Amino acid sequence: MSAQVPTAGRIIQVLGPVVDVEFPPGGLPEVYTALKVTNANLSAAADNLTLEVAQHLGENTVRTIAMDSTEGLGRGMAVTNTGAPIQVPVGKATLGRILNVTGEPVDEMGPVKAQEYWSIHRAPPPFTEQDVRVQMFETGIKVIDLLAPYTRGGKIGLFGGAGVGKTVLLQELIRNVAVERGGFSVFAGVGERTREGNDLYHEMQDTKVIQTDNLEASQAVLVYGQMNEPPGARARVALSALTMAEYFRDVEGRDVLLFVDNIFRFTQAGSEVSALLGRIPSAVGYQPTLATEMGGLQERITSTTKGSITSVQAIYVPADDLTDPAPATAFAHLDATTVLNRSIAELAIFPAVDPLDSTSRILDPAVIGAEHYGVARKVQGILQRYKELQDIIAILGMDELSEDDKLVVARARKIQRFLSQPFFVAKVFTGKDGRYVKLQDTIQGFKEIAEGKHDDIPEGAFYMTGSIDEVVENARKLAAS
């Protein structure tokens, strides 16, 4: 911005989170520019409230969306034009910290000593820099790696109700990326409950992913826009977190895991902002720019020649209606879905991932290889046949089944138990040390079960184990006891 352009304006109207600001002639800031104003109700600091320009209302007036509470603002108050979009700190100084939408720390551990600040509005990587190779992202979790594998630089939708283990699965993924791959994780709490965000922070401390006594050794950043915050904050916090992840990918060349909980609330906040700006709503009351906003976020999540951002996004489905525009728009971008099922959790099989409902675009022999594909399809076939037989078993009992079907049921029950796995972050629940299972060991184990190599081993030996060698060892101990 040139030196001749005035940088000060004044508030002329406050309507909830919408603030109209008037500037002198020739000083109109661009759309997405961050403006600063002092709100004494928030803190004693100067310029403590950020406003983002959303519309030009005339030659000298802009309509802005506030990133925090506007209580305490009044007409005539001075507003400073920063001349740039919202800038957030990036780099290793952010590790181990809890930040808000504007990159300010909310963990009471002092300022973030970042060397660089990046704009949250960025273009996706150009085609020439994107990595076009389709590669599998190994998680070390058997059920995911075998049946619904993740794509490096892909987007995964995580569906799960309350209490089925969604948070534990997220934490295990964060732990595995940090410890097994030396990667970083960025967690975006979009419309998060404050309690859930607090719980996640303390659980990350317990697993040493965040080390408050040595922040440089931490391997995760938490960025929260809580559900009590204005829609402007909730609509932008995912972009703030993504910007921090992009730095680790593009500058440090790392494989980064980006968690967004919940992507529906990102859309919901955008809908609120759209209504506040007076736009005519589209289908089911959503903003007319729904697909554009979602695409702007999702297209930045990709692999480049330097590194990758793999995103796991929790998706709330309103009234279980998958045709609702919000989840339907998100589905178009997903490479894999991981569905957590309460009926599986009730069997005490954790992670409670549904092996038949979870999907992946890369479950294809051209990508994962013929052996992996063949074993995955064989396992799914056995589980599907078992599902079909369950009504007959419930009514008539096992004795009415043919010998072939009895064998299918026996193998399916072993597969079901072998899909369970002790997690590092869940040792307090299971009493067992966690297991990271390499992909080849996963394929080999399920191949042997499906082929009947372990038909003589009791079901109990398969429960909460890592590799098939551990199952054989369990069976030997059971036989000796």
From Swiss-Prot:
It is an enzyme of class 7 (translocase). Its EC number is 7.1.2.2. This is ATP synthase subunit beta. InterPro entries: AAA+_ATPase, ATP-synt_VA_C, ATP_synth_F1_bsu, ATPase_a/bsu_AS, ATPase_alpha/beta_chains, ATPase_F1/V1/A1_a/bsu_N, ATPase_F1/V1/A1_a/bsu_N_sf, ATPase_F1/V1/A1_a/bsu_nucl-bd. It is found in: Cell inner membrane. SUPFAM superfamilies: C-terminal domain of alpha and beta subunits of F1 ATP synthase, N-terminal domain of alpha and beta subunits of F1 ATP synthase, P-loop containing nucleoside triphosphate hydrolases. Produces ATP from ADP in the presence of a proton gradient across the membrane. The catalytic sites are hosted primarily by the beta subunits. Pfam families: ATP-synt_ab, ATP-synt_ab_N, ATP-synt_VA_C. It comes from Myxococcus xanthus (strain DK1622). F-type ATPases have 2 components, CF(1) - the catalytic core - and CF(0) - the membrane proton channel. CF(1) has five subunits: alpha(3), beta(3), gamma(1), delta(1), epsilon(1). CF(0) has three main subunits: a(1), b(2) and c(9-12). The alpha and beta chains form an alternating ring which encloses part of the gamma chain. CF(1) is attached to CF(0) by a central stalk formed by the gamma and epsilon chains, while a peripheral stalk is formed by the delta and b chains. Belongs to the ATPase alpha/beta chains family. It comes from the Bacteria. ATP binds at residues 160-167. One of its GO terms (molecular function) is ATP binding. CDD domains: ATP-synt_F1_beta_C, ATP-synt_F1_beta_N, F1-ATPase_beta_CD. The gene is atpD. Keywords: ATP synthesis, ATP-binding, Cell inner membrane, Cell membrane, CF(1), Hydrogen ion transport, Ion transport, Membrane, Nucleotide-binding, Translocase, Transport. It is a peripheral membrane protein.
